[in-house]
């Protein structure tokens, strides 16, 4: 039986260190980090954003985390959803062409909100921890996209990037390999996003990225609470790659 890809991912996420990153990689991480923040600020004028903010505020209470380009404070989950939407809604966010994945919207929005929340509680994240987590998130999301061979039916910038966000959050949380594996499985249970919104050009397209970013946070929370997830995520008979990416 082939080794489960989620297990390979878990080992990779767990064992990778900042020191493994080349100088070129670190430089590019910083470039795309700043680029994504800039795109998120530009997206603060996005379509239906006021409506989104009004409803997102009712979904979860709290004013712990920042929305890009504003002085607004929302709960961790609400700010993640809004920031992911702002980053992707103009479709200026960076893309891995070969993977057909915009990785940073889901990954950075969830990572920023989580780090801001734990910082408010006195648990500080240093730059090296942040960058290796970001790198691993992009690595996993892009790898999933590159492996896909079939016609694009589900919205890969949302589906693949959700797993990338879990990878980044798992690293920043210093999860064990077993915990990372559980988090990936729990994320699979929540993964969503289709191409119909892309075909029709409706604003919910960008929100699909936000839904998965928020789901990544829920996956982290459930894992921390000791909740198990399915283990056969990428190799099982009901696998992600068959359902969402049509991998051969």
Residues covered by each model-derived region:
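Generic N-terminal targeting/processing segments that precede catalytic cores or assembly contacts
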Residues: 1-101, 113-120
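Alpha-helical support elements that line or immediately flank enzyme active sites
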Residues: 36-43, 103-128, 163-175
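Active-site nucleophile and cofactor-binding loops and adjacent substrate-binding regions
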Residues: 99-106, 129-134, 150-162, 205-209
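Beta-strand segments within the central parallel beta-sheet cores of soluble alpha/beta enzyme folds
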Residues: 124-138, 177-189, 199, 231-238
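Flexible, glycine-rich active-site loops centered on histidine and acidic residues
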Residues: 136, 140-155, 189-217
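Acidic/serine-rich, low-complexity amphipathic helices located in mid- to C-terminal regulatory regions
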Residues: 167, 171, 175, 194-234
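Single conserved hydrophobic/aromatic residue that forms the stacking wall/gate
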Residues: 240-248
């Amino acid at each position: 039986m082939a080794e489960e890809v989620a297990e390979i991912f878990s080992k990779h996420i767990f064992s990778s260190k900042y020191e493994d990153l080349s100088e070129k990689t670190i430089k590019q991480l910083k470039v795309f980090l700043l680029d994504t923040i800039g795109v998120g600020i530009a997206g603060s004028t996005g379509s239906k954003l006021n409506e989104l903010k009004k409803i997102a505020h009712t979904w979860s209470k709290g004013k712990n985390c920042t929305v890009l380009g504003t002085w607004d404070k929302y709960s961790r989950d609400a700010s993640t959803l809004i920031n992911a939407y702002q980053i992707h809604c103009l479709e200026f966010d960076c893309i891995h062409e070969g993977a057909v994945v915009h990785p940073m919207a889901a990954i950075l929005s969830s990572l920023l909100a989580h780090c801001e929340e734990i910082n408010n509680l006195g648990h500080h994240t240093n730059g090296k921890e942040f960058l290796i987590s970001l790198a691993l998130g992009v690595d996993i999301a892009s790898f999933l996209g590159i492996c896909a061979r079939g016609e694009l039916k589900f919205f890969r910038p949302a589906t693949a990037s959700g797993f990338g966000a879990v990878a980044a959050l798992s690293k920043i949380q210093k999860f064990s390999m077993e915990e990372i594996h559980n988090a990936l499985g729990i994320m699979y249970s929540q993964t969503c996003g289709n191409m119909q919104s892309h075909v029709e050009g409706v604003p919910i397209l960008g929100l699909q990225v936000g839904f998965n970013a928020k789901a990544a946070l829920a996956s982290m929370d459930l894992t921390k609470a000791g909740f198990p997830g399915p283990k056969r995520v990428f190799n099982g008979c009901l696998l992600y790659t068959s359902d969402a990416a049509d991998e051969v």
